[in-house]
Curated annotation (Swiss-Prot):
Protein name: Putative S-adenosyl-L-methionine-dependent methyltransferase MAP_4078
Source organism superkingdom: Bacteria
SUPFAM superfamilies, sorted: S-adenosyl-L-methionine-dependent methyltransferases
Record keywords, A-Z: Methyltransferase, S-adenosyl-L-methionine, Transferase
Record's signal peptide: none
The family this protein is said to belong to: Belongs to the UPF0677 family.
Disulfide-bond pairs as recorded: none
Enzyme Commission numbers on file: 2.1.1.-
Stretches for region Disordered: 294-320
Length: 320
């Protein structure tokens, strides 16, 4: 279903369902022979959400009819598991390095089913602010509480739509804009229109004191490439048609319907112009760093993203 300006969602629908797909990839990596990351809560979320296409990433085998008709699908899905593992490790290491360096405020934008507040060994005195749709945060908190999970930090949930006045909600929740903070935008930007992305970083700029850090998964220059999008859409449509024959009542959403394919400013360039020291790593390079590689013989096997890490150095004080 196409996006609207004020749409909202449960965890099993629309944008929420994509968080389950990511959790399934983390579960698959966690349960693999040589896992790069460990997320013991990913499987908990999947079990709580019930059956859905998101479980394909965490299942050992695809339905035989689909595997035979689409032989590239299994290696393509493994490529995405490897991509998600490298992505997760990148953000894990970013937050641990920031808190080890003395940052005690962590802000996770569009937190989804991110479980870092429960699984990372944050330094004493760290506060983690999670921002997302109210029903998504409620599902996560309820599910983890039912399994006896306890945060490893001071956790503050901020139920707010990032298209609304989230800076005010963050401040009201106790965030101190005059102390350094560490921010993440993981799996977020494609779901925002270009203007909303611009506003997001302008707002972060007003809240991030000198010494703050930010990590971003950013669309690469080929994000709006029409040919690549069409290839991906055709592959997805074939899978949907096959799945409709197997399970007529199950709809498989196309993530492209949830993304905004618009020209947008390069994140690294924007941060660099606004007083941040920036490092940009293309996705294949990041995966290689963690000894993971996309399938070499499958086109468009992983998102052509860039991973941006930056630290604010200029001395302009944030807005009051």
């Amino acid at each position: 279903m196409p996006r609207t300006d004020d749409d909202s969602w449960e965890i099993t629908e629309s944008v929420g369902a994509t968080a389950l797909g990511v959790a399934a990839a983390r579960a698959a990596e966690t349960e693999s022979e040589n896992p790069l990351i460990s997320d013991p809560f990913a499987r908990v979320f999947l079990d709580a959400a019930g059956d859905g296409m998101w479980n394909w990433f965490a299942a050992p085998n695809l339905p035989a009819q689909i595997a035979e008709a689409e032989p590239d699908l299994k290696p393509r899905m493994q490529g995405m598991v490897d991509y998600m593992a490298a992505r997760t490790a990148f953000f894990d290491n970013f937050f641990l390095a920031a808190t080890h360096a003395g940052v005690r405020q962590v802000v996770i934008l569009a937190a989804g089913l991110d479980s870092r507040a429960w699984r990372l060994p944050f330094e004493d005195g760290t506060t983690v602010y999670e921002l997302d749709q109210p029903r998504v945060l409620e599902f996560k908190a309820t599910t983890l509480a039912e399994h006896g999970a306890r945060p490893t930090c001071h956790l503050v949930s901020v139920p707010v739509d990032l298209r609304h006045d989230w800076p005010a909600a963050l401040r009201q929740a106790g965030f101190d804009a005059h102390a350094p903070s560490a921010w993440s935008a993981e799996g977020l930007l494609p779901f925002l229109p270009a203007a909303a992305q611009q506003l997001l970083f302008e707002r972060v700029q007003t809240l991030a004191a000198p010494g703050s850090r930010i990590a971003v998964e950013a669309p690469g220059p080929d994000f709006i490439d029409e040919a690549a999008r069409e290839r991906q859409r055709q592959t997805m449509q074939r899978v949907r048609d096959l799945m409709a024959d197997l399970e007529p009542d199950r709809d498989i959403p196309d993530v492209q319907d949830l993304w905004y394919f618009e020209e947008r400013e390069d994140v690294g360039d924007w941060l660099g112009r606004h007083g941040w020291d920036v490092t940009v790593t293309p996705a294949p390079e990041l995966m290689a760093r963690y000894d993971r590689r996309p399938p070499h013989d499958i086109e468009d096997a992983i998102p052509q993203t860039r991973f941006v890490a930056a630290q604010r150095t200029e001395r302009t004080r944030p807005d009051r």
